[in-house]
Amino acid sequence: MFDNKFKISSKFKPDGDQPRAIKQLTAGLKAGQKFQTLLGVTGSGKTFTMANVIENVQKPTLVIAPNKTLAAQLAQEFRTFFPKSAVEYFVSYYDYYQPEAYISSTDTYIEKESQINDEIDRLRHAATVAVMSRQDVVIVASVSCIYGLGSPEFYEEISLSLKIGEAVDREKLIKDLTEMHFLRSEYLSRGKFRAHGETIEIMSPSREIVTRIEIKEDKIKKISEYNFLTGEALGNLEKVLIYPAKHFVVPEPVLEEALNQIEKELNERVAYFKKNKKLLEAERIYRRTKQDLEMMREIGYCNGIENYSRYLTGRAPGEAPYTLVDYFSKDFLIVVDESHVTVPQLNGMYNGDHARKKALIDNGFRLPSAYDNRPMKFSEFEKKINQVIFTSATPGKYEIEKSSCRPHPNPPLIKGREA
């Protein structure tokens, strides 16, 4: 893991109320306070204040904003302050999204339709790679960061470490890349690889860079990189760590057990529908789930695979999903920006998702375990908090109670408490 340090680059120095705010927030974090609130209107320099606090405490940081636009703005500001650190942007990658749904009153099934933004998908992968590989990282995210993402343990376990001089079997390397959901193709793009003789070229899902592995006599002879767009050589490497092409990755033994568990639940669900004389629903769930199982056995993936995430991540029924939060080390900082808007959003996401899933499950479109493909409940999010700073000009009731914070006419004022 990179052990770089946060170091602010700015011609400005803290001014006005900022030095006091920075000092108080830093002291609170170092004293172990769990909740703090920074009061400040837009334009009062909250981002610069927070950048100074992050530099002081040197903690990996997740900044949660209420929407994509504000998240993009904050990411750009933090990149300006931390040009040598990893500042990444993590938001929903859908340009268009129509969730799967069933309207019982009109007997209408609406299939999921979506259009994924390729660049945002790249940025999401860049974010998880950065969190896994370095300490000096700020991820600026929208509230979609509390949706299920796949197991960070499997994501790291299934990654591929290669180094010069290491023994390697070409066919096994190709098989490993396929299990990591890289697609073999003559034409490279993100998440694809190609193999010509003893040379294998891999394009990461997080960068527009190609890693070339050259093999001679069953050993890695050379590792190099080049820019995919320009062809410019970027130099040779002693070793490289390649992360999976998708976030939902599962080791083979876990996948086999998951498929068995899905099959078992399917049989129980079919029996339930038949017992209740719901033959259409029984046929519907049987046909659909069997198709998904066949796809997962063949290629390790299927459309809507997230609906089986409980089994694929080894969770118990009702257990909180893995999200971006779980990719951070335990000692990390959360900053909730515009918390008077963001906290209610975090609080309300679970209920709407549950109501939509209920109609699908009751009518045989999904297995009951699909309930566990969901955003975190707010109570689950609270348990994941190590330390958090809320920022707002008008903090809500939650922030005020948790931080013992009182609004003040001369922001910023900070108060905090341990729990």
Q: Where are each of the predicted segments found?
A:
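ASCE RecA-like P-loop NTPase motor cores
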Residues: 1-405, 419
